[in-house]
């Protein structure tokens, strides 16, 4: 009984911990501001605009180091996925480009080369210019009926290659020996979440997810993975690895690599570092919104990708296929999918927190590739702006969680020995995936 009382007595101290923002700021932001004071021992990460000839890491624009390919994440897609990775070049042929008020600025049929930073839709008035930020790719077909082009392509079972769905690789020089490799994964459709069995909510045409591998002097140091506009960062050594044969061009070599594993959630394609159920967007002990991951088909994006470098303003293709496609399409900052359906549309539904069909996402150059910190942006409840790089894998929960993940309960297992049971239930209500447990997990990684 005494240990139980003591446990409840110290809960307020854990609650107070969440309001101390300087305990866990982004390590790279801290290093840049107070490098000498903190004694990190490594030079600061620079934004592309700060790089000089003396601090440059890559020898020239368009150069993609071999270590970037060798450490490309492998992606376990969900075993019952419906919307698999897709080819942006094929995807674009099923759309025209419209403004928010449904004025067509570029009609079908489209090719990838038709996308750009802006459009002059009328010959009569060549000075009339529509910035791409104000446009939407608008489907010619009824996407509610799952046309074939919306479904994407499964990876080859033996190799993990997807012949008809190249990943997009954008490498950014961050100076002083640092290099960021952004791997973008494109899907034609995002199937949203179910809330208490109802849904899906938050569906949208087009889906861009990505991961960031940050290198220092050719060695991977950190891995960040996107999820619902936010994401999670890890120390690279903490993430699960899988052995794979190294490829030199299209041929296998004799070298064996250890590649990081990430897990793509069913429908939403959010990325996680473990198998199971993952609550998202609602903090602490609420699990109204959850993603699900498992060890489904394995995708190796390094076997088919389009590679570029980016210096904060200019995109440079890495080889012939990318040069043939051009780079203008990457400067398209509009929505890669339809505008949110009008409430009068019979396909549209509403629940108190979300619509069934929402705006499509923006593309790769809208993902803050110039950032010096690891995180793309912060969730609405992360008011202190923390971006911790975890030192251990954040485990999934639920029936999909793997046995060695302690039933997916994470730090909630601390409560198992509390007696009497009513006191344990009270502690679980407050702590299990609640404020105290969340805070402990957040600050300890």
Regions found by a protein language model. Give the residues of each.
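A domain-level signal for the mature, folded cores of soluble proteins
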Residues: 18-205, 223-445
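Short beta-strand micro-motifs enriched in acidic
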Residues: 214-218
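Short, surface-exposed coil-to-beta transition loops
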Residues: 206-210
């Amino acid at each position: 009984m005494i240990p139980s009382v003591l446990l409840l007595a110290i809960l307020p101290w854990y609650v107070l911990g969440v309001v101390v923002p300087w305990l866990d700021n982004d390590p790279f932001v801290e290093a840049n501001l107070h490098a000498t004071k903190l004694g990190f021992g490594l030079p600061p990460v620079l934004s592309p605009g700060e790089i000089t000839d003396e601090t440059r890491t890559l020898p020239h624009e368009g150069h993609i180091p071999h270590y970037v390919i060798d450490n490309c994440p492998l992606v376990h897609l969900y075993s019952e996925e419906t919307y698999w990775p897709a080819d942006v070049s094929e995807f674009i042929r099923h759309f025209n480009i419209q403004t928010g008020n449904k004025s067509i600025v570029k009609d079908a049929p489209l090719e990838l080369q038709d996308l750009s930073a802006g459009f002059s839709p009328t010959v009569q008035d060549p000075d009339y210019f529509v910035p791409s930020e104000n446009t939407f790719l608008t489907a010619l077909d009824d996407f509610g009926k799952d046309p074939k082009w919306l479904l994407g392509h499964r990876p080859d079972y033996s190799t993990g290659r997807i012949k008809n769905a190249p990943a997009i690789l954008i490498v950014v020089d961050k100076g002083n020996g640092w290099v960021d490799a952004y791997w973008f994964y494109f899907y034609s459709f995002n199937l949203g979440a179910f809330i208490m069995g109802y849904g899906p909510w938050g569906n949208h045409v087009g889906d861009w997810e990505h991961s960031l591998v940050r290198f220092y002097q050719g060695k991977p140091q950190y891995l960040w993975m996107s999820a619902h506009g936010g994401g999670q960062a890890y120390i690279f050594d903490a993430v699960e690895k899988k052995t794979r044969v190294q490829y030199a061009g299209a041929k296998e070599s004799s070298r064996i690599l250890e590649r990081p594993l990430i897990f793509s959630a069913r429908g939403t394609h959010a990325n996680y570092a473990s198998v199971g159920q993952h609550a998202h967007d609602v903090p602490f002990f609420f699990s109204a919104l959850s993603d699900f991951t498992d060890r489904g088909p394995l995708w190796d994006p390094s076997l088919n990708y389009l590679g570029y470098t980016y210096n904060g303003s200019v995109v440079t293709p890495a080889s012939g296929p990318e040069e043939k496609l051009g780079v203008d399409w990457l400067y398209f900052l509009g929505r890669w999918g339809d505008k949110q359906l009008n409430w009068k549309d019979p396909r549209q539904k509403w629940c108190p927190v979300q619509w069934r069909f929402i705006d499509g996402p923006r593309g790769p150059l809208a993902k803050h590739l110039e950032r010096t910190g690891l995180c793309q942006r912060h969730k609405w409840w992360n008011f202190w702006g923390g971006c911790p790089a975890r030192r251990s894998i954040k485990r999934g929960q639920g029936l999909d969680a793997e046995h060695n993940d302690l039933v997916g309960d994470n730090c909630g297992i601390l409560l198992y020995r509390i007696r009497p049971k009513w006191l344990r239930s009270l502690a679980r209500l407050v702590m299990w995936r609640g404020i105290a447990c969340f805070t402990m997990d957040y600050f300890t990684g």
